[in-house]
Amino acid sequence: IIGQSMGGYVGQMYSQMYPYQMRGFIAIDSAPLQRRYVTKLEIWMLKRMTSIYRYCPWQLLLKLGVDGVAISEYGRTLMHEMMMTYDGDKARYARLSGHGSRLLAEAMEADLPYEIQCPALLICGEKDRAGSAIRYNRAWHEETGIPIKWIVGAGHNSNTDAPDEVNRLIEMFIANL
């Protein structure tokens, strides 16, 4: 399973439910689901993101969303296009994004092991500014020994900021399974 950002959480949940079904796991710009990595304040905030998004002006949300996840023009353009599908319906964006954040908080609060029982790789943009992704990935790597590759000059969407490098790492990982 290869998961980027929220997709990495889905991969960890799958691993929790079916621990010996995965042959490999790659988390791209994601973070560990284990409770020990996050603070009470972070969980509290995740549970309230719907309201935060709802009361934040749309143009500010758009700027923070685009600038917060991508460094490259290509990555920023993709994020802008995705967010613009919600232009004029900020409430829908707030509900959807907030719902995902709340589910994430609940998964962390469940305090399940979320152990990866297969070969794994962490990929993270060295300029990732989404939440505390860099801190989480450092700790995840140090505690579990899962190898980590830092993508130079990439943000939270390192697969759009440096697609050739991310694809090369994925191909190498799969070739070594």
Identify what each model region corresponds to.
Residues 1-3, 28:
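Short beta-strand immediately N-terminal to the catalytic nucleophile in serine-hydrolase-like folds
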Residues 3, 7, 11:
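Gly/Ala-rich beta-loop-alpha elbow adjacent to hydrolase catalytic centers
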Residues 12-17, 23-55:
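Flexible "cap/lid" loop of the alpha/beta hydrolase fold
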Residues 21, 116, 143-144:
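Short, structured coil segments at secondary-structure junctions
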Residues 36-41, 134-136, 161-163:
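Short aromatic-enriched loop/helix-cap "lid" or pocket-rim segments at secondary-structure transitions
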Residues 36-38, 55-115:
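Conserved alpha/beta-hydrolase catalytic His-Asp/Glu region
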Residues 120-154, 160:
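Conserved loop-alpha-helix segment in the C-terminal half of the alpha/beta-hydrolase fold
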Residues 160-172:
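Post-His helix in hydrolase/transferase enzymes
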